[in-house]
Amino acid sequence: MEIRAAEISAILKEQIANFGTEAESAEVGQVLSVGDGIARVYGLDNVQAGEMVEFANGVKGMALNLESDNVGIVIFGEDRGIKEGDVVKRTQTIVDVPVGKGLLGRVVDGLGNPIDGKGDLVDVERKRAEVKAPGIIPRKSVHEPVQTGIKAIDSLIPIGRGQRELIIGDRQTGKTAVILDTILNQKAVNDKAKDDSEKLFCVYVAVGQKRSTVAQVVKVLADHGALDYTIVVAATASEPAPLQFLAPYTGCTMGEFFRDNGMHAVIFYDDLTKQAVAYRQMSLLLRRPPGREAFPGDVFYLHSRLLERAAKLNDDNGAGSLTALPVIETQANDVSAYIPTNVISITDGQIFLETDLFFKGIRPAVNVGLSVSRVGSSAQIKAMKQVAGSIKLELAQYREMAAFAQFASDLDPATQKLLARGARLTELLKQAQYSPLAVEEQVCVIYAGTRGYLDKLKTTDVVRYEASLLGALRTSGADLLESIRTGKALSKEIEQKLVKFLDDFGKKFA
């Protein structure tokens, strides 16, 4: 075979002409030390605070401490595969996560990667995990209700769309149960909705919980058909502290997608105590100076910048909303500890759950005296306002009298009546788990309580009376429920119908 010099030179010229000159440039650094989920890196001179970096083995990290001679990086994963001298690359992107409707029904980790084995995410875009909260001008005051389906909350501590309402209590007082009931209660509304702007989407963020607990929550949601409108973000106890720190921001960004596109979402952070503990661990390992209870000085800002992102937007901005229900776990009912007081001061009210009430069988164990909703009353529907107005006062008087009555032997009839009414109302506010009630059913039940229909009954019969009443309402009183649902207020005509219905029912009930 003859080799022609001209041909060789032609081939070489062609290859040189097509040679890509764009060399890949990546700013790199070297690991100085690594341990406890923190890496100290030399180099990376132009790295930004909060920027995602990549280690040689593919594990990602986030630059948090930018010091004169090194960079402190928290590692989103196992630090075992990283060693001294390894190369670290800048990605030149601030930490971002997937958002969109493709996440509904999925379980993802703190970075938004799916962990439910259902394959890759589809129909998603990417947004930064940390963004500024909306300012004052785009907002509107809270005026639409979020129905939890729990009588004690919807009547006494109403929650509005765009509100931040704290759920606070010791371990095992039913905090997650309140969240689950709220999610399940949206099913009826969402099934009837004509379009997405009428639905209420849910985002559940589990921080530092056992995997078995998260699996149980997902199973309950799936069994009740509630996963279709829910996103679960799970950073469990076995995951590194940086992922537990990031998970609430990840979930919030996912919820903001609905808020910014004229839809409504509610996000549950379960719980922020564990996020603060994870942040404390990271901060101490990064050698940031500790403050009260060894938390870093900016732990207030950690929670305030997260919760300020919940908002009700005005009509010019799409009228969407993001409601936040953070959870805080207290130790021995100590609401005056550092993190609880911080979060109470950031939120628009709190639902206080008590161990004593829980063990007395009052479940949900809501302490009506200490719980408050600072903006929710303007979101409550008129019918509920009309029937529940007196219940708070009557329960407060009952608690005051009950303490006093323990010492007094003979009580006048008025006091006895007050105590009897209070005991029946307390009984009426009890509710089984996973059985949320529609607001029109709550209105009828509470009307029966506040207008004296329970006074003739034994306290032990109240629960049975309520169950029978609800059964009767759903069968023979369906038109009455429909008129309350559509009218959203008790007109004279509807009230007369309700009184007649309760009178007739009272005669049959025995």
From Swiss-Prot:
Site (Required for activity) location in chain: S371
The keyword Cell inner membrane is annotated on this UniProt entry: yes
Reaction catalysed by this enzyme: ATP + H2O + 4 H(+)(in) = ADP + phosphate + 5 H(+)(out)
Domain of life: Bacteria
CDD domains membership: ATP-synt_F1_alpha_C, ATP-synt_F1_alpha_N, F1-ATPase_alpha_CD
Gene Ontology biological process terms from the UniProt entry: ATP biosynthetic process
Pfam families for the chain: ATP-synt_ab, ATP-synt_ab_C, ATP-synt_ab_N
Enzyme Commission (EC) number: 7.1.2.2
Signal peptide: none
Keywords from the UniProt entry: ATP synthesis, ATP-binding, Cell inner membrane, Cell membrane, CF(1), Hydrogen ion transport, Ion transport, Membrane, Nucleotide-binding, Translocase, Transport
One GO term describing the cellular component: plasma membrane
Membrane topology: Peripheral membrane protein
Subcellular location: Cell inner membrane
An MF annotation (GO) of this entry: ATP binding
UniProt entry tagged with the keyword Membrane: yes
Cited Gene3D superfamilies: 2.40.30.20, ATP synthase alpha/beta chain, C-terminal domain, P-loop containing nucleotide triphosphate hydrolases
Binding site for ATP: G169, D170, R171, Q172, T173, G174, K175, T176
Task performed by this protein: Produces ATP from ADP in the presence of a proton gradient across the membrane. The alpha chain is a regulatory subunit.
Family of the protein in this entry: Belongs to the ATPase alpha/beta chains family.
Summary of subunit composition and partner proteins: F-type ATPases have 2 components, CF(1) - the catalytic core - and CF(0) - the membrane proton channel. CF(1) has five subunits: alpha(3), beta(3), gamma(1), delta(1), epsilon(1). CF(0) has four main subunits: a(1), b(1), b'(1) and c(9-12).
Name under which the protein is recorded: ATP synthase subunit alpha
Organism: Rhodospirillum rubrum
Gene name for this UniProt entry: atpA
